[in-house]
């Protein structure tokens, strides 16, 4: 049978689909520049199913022998795929909405097959040709830009929301033409998702896709509509412009946007907004309070303490029984408080130890097991870390189901006691923003089996309930997952220590949530080059600095450089909590790049950045802009910059005097070693 093509046009974007025994993505074109982004056809999507009788999982692509029917309506195309021998009784309906300069895809699944359950479905895959000038954005942590050809192959799939996918969008662009395609999942009350980028070895095609783990996985015939709309849109520019498309949608539509004014979050206490620096303080010795005070005095700036191991139970063991606290906890907290240091203790927000009193099952079988996540056969999902029981075996921690009343009350009661008994300033509830949604299938729980919106909704309900424990509840969590920010005031950005980072998350959300700290403990040997990279990035990205142990601070090199950056963060805090990140300046410099292979959270431990980092911020009350440049090299750097500021003469502040002349948005200057320079634009 002769193949048939369908052209979907929206603004400058033209997408060609081909019916050839299934539905293929045949072309992605830019009408404005005449660019053809894709030269080789690829399947448009894939659908994964599981046989209920034997648990065998298999995946079928849109090219695997489907009958395709297309109906054209006003402003949309309707594609119905049916008759696939590998998936009998399953129909996929794909709706392409054309308008407003973009294509918006919706997906509906229909199954009358009782022998299989549908488990994961892609939205349409966006594919493009790899090349020297072709780059992609993926939302790991702060966001990362990858060259499409830097490695022979790559494949990364991350769970949204989690440490590996802070937002639900991807993008690619041609750097030489500054044109690309935004690929966003506009799901305002979001379901959990999988976010994927790949290029197979020996192939020249890069695939961007987002998938949804499906609902109703405990039985067959689990028909459903995927949540949200998959938006494809041409844009001018690079990662920042793609971020602005996601921001525009999220601010107007997303259910997680908190109330703000010209000073940022309205529900976050002022001390937290203004705090420039964090210590990672563990009660693993008697004088942690005095050590934290001594480090704060040496730093010369306000600090807060993220307080671990305050409980008698071991770390990652006997959860969730954090009370009673250690006998000397109160005195250590009092020592820090007398020095003006705010204290934020740690608890975990998702784990219950299966042996929760030493080597004994105390409450797990009675309370933990009925309320933990389980597969469709009733087997609990279990995680292990480095902690061990008294018999030497690894501690087995069950992942609790956030939909259950028992777990919601357990966390709420802990928050109540920490604020009302211990009188703490904030609470850190670990893993909520970092860990994936588990596809719980316990039929006794109040949610559909598998994926969907229930996991995120349940945690947001849990957090809302926890806020009722006290009038001054301030909650933070691990990592920067966007759908929780309405209930969470601060995100520990600890994994923002990888190669290729760009500040996309804060470009989208800076005034809506506080980001704080990175994992300096992940930098082996306290590598100086690596640490200086992230000193500079933390400042220009708008992150509250630190999250290092006081003993590491005393050992590290270049404390004067670090103190200087923290002091600047303290002095101009209002530009960060009450400001917007504008497009960062484009910079080039002649200093040696800062390279390290000692960052354990980076791919292969490797990071490689220019010596000079920069950021541009705008105060919301006045509109005044603040340009920050940091030379993290130990040598002078000749810097050329292009920045979105009016031409004119600007006074230099910080480690340079005089002025710089900006003409056609460009200027040059020579920065001293280990320096920070800033300028204002009214």
Regions found by a protein language model. Name each.
Residues 28, 211, 220-227, 455-657, ...:
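Active-site-proximal substrate-binding groove within the catalytic cores of carbohydrate-active enzymes
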